[in-house]
């Protein structure tokens, strides 16, 4: 599992640890909670679905929107491209996360970096508000989901191993 961490150290999380479809994705101080942890699931062709550890749901585009300002929320797995993301390395070692359907990047509404800032998609802009640090979470020390069987990350797929440098920052 990974944290999707902003340059200021805050992370993307599921708002109020809500398990329902449509729950918002926002920025918040990292506290080790499983609703702040994400698994990158290989979707083929260099694409990833981003699954929340706590809810098991995926980062998705609200209402399937593709315009600037479309909010991010969580939703159960679909076959649509609104849940598919590509990772792009930046010169400073961070990662941009681009939605395949919308061809836009994970961003924060109003470039707000305080607790509660809503995640959205936006066209490429030069700046830190679209750059993320993907930080691996140690499964033995992080808080875990209530599911007792979930103790370790599963073995990576060949595609995940190939792109592992993209995921570890």
What name fits each language-model region?
Residues 117-121:
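Low-complexity, intrinsically disordered Gly/Pro/Thr-rich segments
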Residues 21-34, 69-78, 123-127:
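Surface-exposed turn/loop modules enriched in turn-prone residues
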Residues 79, 123, 154-156, 162:
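Intrinsic disorder/low-complexity segments
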Residues 1-19, 34-66, 84-113, 131-149, ...:
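Extracellular glycan-recognition/adhesion modules and their associated mucin-like linkers
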């Amino acid at each position: 599992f990974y944290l999707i961490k902003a340059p200021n150290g805050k992370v993307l999380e599921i708002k109020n640890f809500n398990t329902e479809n449509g729950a918002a994705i926002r920025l918040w101080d990292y506290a080790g909670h499983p609703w702040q942890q994400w698994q990158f699931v290989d979707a083929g062709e260099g694409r990833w679905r981003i699954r929340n550890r706590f809810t098991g749901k995926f980062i998705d585009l609200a209402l399937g929107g593709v315009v600037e300002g479309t909010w991010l929320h969580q939703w159960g797995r679909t076959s649509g491209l609104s849940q598919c993301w590509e990772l792009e390395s930046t010169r400073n070692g961070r990662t941009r996360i681009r939605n395949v359907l919308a061809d836009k990047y994970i961003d924060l509404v109003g470039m707000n970096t305080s607790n509660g800032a809503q995640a959205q998609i936006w066209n490429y802009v030069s700046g830190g508000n679209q750059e993320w640090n993907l930080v691996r979470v140690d499964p033995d020390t992080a808080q875990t989901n209530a599911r007792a069987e979930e103790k370790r990350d599963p073995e990576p797929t060949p595609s995940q191993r190939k792109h592992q440098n993209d995921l570890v920052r």
